[in-house]
Swiss-Prot record:
Listed name of the protein: Pantothenate synthetase
Major localization listed first in the record, in broad terms: cytoplasm
Biological source species: Acidithiobacillus ferrooxidans (strain ATCC 23270 / DSM 14882 / CIP 104768 / NCIMB 8455)
GO CC, one annotated term: cytosol
Pathway involvement of the protein, from the record: Cofactor biosynthesis; (R)-pantothenate biosynthesis; (R)-pantothenate from (R)-pantoate and beta-alanine: step 1/1
NCBIfam families reported in the protein's UniProt record: panC
Entry keyword set: ATP-binding, Cytoplasm, Ligase, Nucleotide-binding, Pantothenate biosynthesis
């Protein structure tokens, strides 16, 4: 396995390649959701590069940057077993050599970034756009693989790529779930046993709302029912909303292809999920 920690070695390797390259950016602590993205990349490109970097720029004050799980040796083993042969593991000194307080920032489109997670995490998506812009310039892939679990992030990056005329195709990877329906997340390991037993109710609630989202259903009534269900189970909901899948504008009435989005805390852990109306 080739592991690059500097830009010079990475670019030398990149220039030697023949054929398409897919980039799968991650923050490590890899799980089956990440590995599914790696497999998707291998099916769509002749070469795959996985980046592992916990980006401090996308964490706000009081968030879990210091405690975010860092499991590099385990991640490399999982990638090796999945057939991935090339990994980029930059550090803060490489990504932000002058520090993080006075750097050029890539601002996300306002209409997509001020709602949902952006409403409670100011600066988060600017951090995401900045680090992904840097990675795209360093790696120069033909394909960028992003999961639909972070659907708002996916839409923001798709729009950023279009707005900045970046020469890369953004390819979505379907959201992956554990056997009981809970969306895979690196933060799931922080759930205690009791919380882990309750956690799948977030997905159950969204799937139930999607099934009940008929043409004449009132979104406000559906959302209120789902919100109450989550609260009864011990969640502290942050949002539960039906939005257009492209514009992320809120909807008063269901429509095919729209998505239900939810964020809720269970104990100290913030969970997010989304389900499409089929």
């Amino acid at each position: 396995m080739a592991i690059f920690k500097d830009i010079a070695g990475l670019r030398q390797w990149r220039q030697s390649l023949h054929g398409t390259l897919a980039l799968v950016p991650t923050m490590g602590n890899l799980h089956e959701g990440h590995l599914a993205l790696v497999r998707l990349a291998a099916n769509r490109a002749e070469h795959v590069l996985v980046s592992i970097y916990v980006n401090p720029l996308q964490f706000g004050p009081g968030e879990d940057f210091a405690n975010y799980p860092r499991t590099l040796d385990q991640d490399l083993q999982r990638l090796h077993e999945a057939g991935c042969q090339t990994v980029f593991t930059p550090d803060d000194g490489l990504m932000y050599p002058r520090g993080r307080q006075d750097i050029s920032i890539v601002m996300p489109p306002r209409s997509l970034s001020k709602v949902l997670c952006g409403a409670s995490r100011p600066g988060h998506f600017a951090g995401v756009c900045t680090v992904l812009s840097k990675l795209l310039h360093m790696v120069a892939p033909e394909i960028l693989i992003l999961g639909e679990k972070d659907y708002q992030q996916l839409r923001i990056v798709q729009q950023m790529v279009a707005d900045l005329n970046l020469n890369v195709q953004v390819l979505p990877g379907p959201l992956q779930r554990e056997a009981d329906g809970l969306a895979y997340s690196s933060r799931n390991i922080y759930l205690n046993l009791a919380e882990r037993q309750v956690a799948p109710l977030l997905a159950e609630t969204l799937f139930d709302l999607a099934r009940r989202s008929t043409n004449d259903a009132a979104v406000s009534d559906l959302a209120a029912t789902g919100w109450e269900r989550l609260e009864r189970a011990g969640f502290l909901p942050e949002y539960l909303e039906l939005r257009d899948a492209q514009t992320l504008q809120s909807l008063a009435l269901p429509q095919p292809g729209a998505r239900w989005f939810a964020a809720a805390r269970l104990g100290q852990i913030r969970l997010i999920d989304n389900v499409i109306i089929s």
